[in-house]
Amino acid sequence: MQNGDIITGVDRFPPANTGTQEITVNFPEPMRGAPKVFAMWEDTTITLTYVDKLVITGATSSGFKIATNRLKPSENWWFCYIAIYNR
């Protein structure tokens, strides 16, 4: 793999009211092109009782948008991601 082919990271949804929330995640360095992005909750004990799945939209070389339907307010929900650019 060359530089710009894979980026991994951790980010969080800030505390908010219940309901759908979307944030933009910026990569620490640009990728070569629009990557495939995969994400999962950092805490594997989180179940759908508390939060819904992660939905990724708008992946570009500089970052992506990610949304979730958070059912529990006033907590930080951490997730990890991997972005892979395959030419």
Language model features by range: what are they?
Residues 1-36, 42-45, 56-87:
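Extracellular receptor-binding modules and their adjoining Ser/Thr/Gly/Asp/Asn-rich linkers
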Residues 51-53:
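Short, surface-exposed beta-strand/strand-loop-strand elements in extracellular ectodomains
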